[in-house]
Amino acid sequence: FPTGYANGALKEKPDSLCRQSIYVRKYPLGKDYGGTLNLAEKKLLSMKEKKPTGMAAFLNLQPARTFDDDSIIGITVQECGGKSVDVTDCVDGTVLRWEKPAGEWTLCVCGKTRNAGPHRDYINMTNPESCKILLETVYEPHWKHYSEEFGKTIAGFFSDEPELGNAELYIKGNVMGCDQDLPWSDCVEADLSARLGKEWKMMLPMLWDELLPDSLTVRKNAAMVRTVYMDVLTKRVRNAFSEQIGGWCREHGVQYIGHMIEDEGQHCRTGSGLGHYFRGLQGQDMSGVDDIGGQILPQGEEEPKQNSLGSPRNGEFYHYGLAKLAESAAQIEPQKHGNAMCEVFGNYGWAEGIRLEKYLADHLLVRGITQFVPHAFSAAPFPDPDCPPHFYAHGHNPQYRWFAKLMAYMNRVATITSSDLHVAHVAILYHGEQEWADCSAMPMEKPLHK
């Protein structure tokens, strides 16, 4: 957890199979610029160092690998009106020598690095050869030992919160344009070059808002570049990861299911997400979402504004949007046959109880969820602090006998609700592509609420 560790195999694999990011360093060429600038002295030739915050600081994660293949993609200068000039050839060693014309200009240094992100020993979700390592180290050993049980005892494989893994661990608000590194690979570079043309390197700085000229032309161009980048990226994720894993499973007589992180808009962002909910899960045999830790609550569409960990809680999305993501993918993708899965009940604490679990089940059933993965049974001694409630808890859960009644009820209702085609009278546009172009785009939960 999260999916992508591949049994630790990436610790010993070639650098080319590991995760990679791109970054930008921007520097205004003001009145004190005299025609030369030492890029090394200004620390513009490497990614800006950041201290871990939030969950990364709490977990005190240490880099699993350190890489020495950092490189510069290109160096450009941007004029406030939108004009860009490639000055890569004007750099002598680490010194820029360029006569600045009149006007306001910003230096942009774009580079790529593998020394970014919290999980540097995980597969690169955009590289098919890297994703194949997950098959070789986890899936194929299962086939080797238990092939006779595939399709019988072993129903399939579950991907749990696979991530692109750039930026900070579980970062919030990481819309396109914010100060973060972005996922990269040779595959993405080739596709982006083909889509944007020979001047693609000069367009890369538009992926970030920092010091972006306040010009309508520039903003339109930036929206185009960001949309193309995310389109290329998420199609690579779909093909390299989701379709490849799902294809292997079906070839071996089992299903492929799971979910990504959907919280706080992550379903259409990088970082802890896969950039696009539908593309990220397109190779699966069921759609999937996760309700955990007080996300869905009775009358919880407005309050509370924070979860149990003190992080922001978007109750409007959890109440109106979460289950609809899974239902939509299950209905519009023939391969899923209407099957929408939800991992449910986990980490609500011991106060959850059967009454709240019944509410959660009903909430999800009427919104199109047909398959459930209850979270979680724990073999650890009671009380295990890891994400309770635990349904048996070695006999310490007094409501466990009634949990069986709830499961029987959910099975009966889900059998009925999944027995025919859903007829939708209203269509809501998935806002992923709109947010890539404009971070102020209305999220889908707003019209769903109305």
Could you tell me what each predicted segment is?
Residues 103-145, 346, 414-418, 423-441:
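Catalytic grooves of carbohydrate-active enzymes
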Residues 93-99:
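Generic recognition of long tandem-repeat/solenoid scaffolds
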Residues 1-37, 146-156, 161-450:
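Carbohydrate-binding surfaces of carbohydrate-active enzymes
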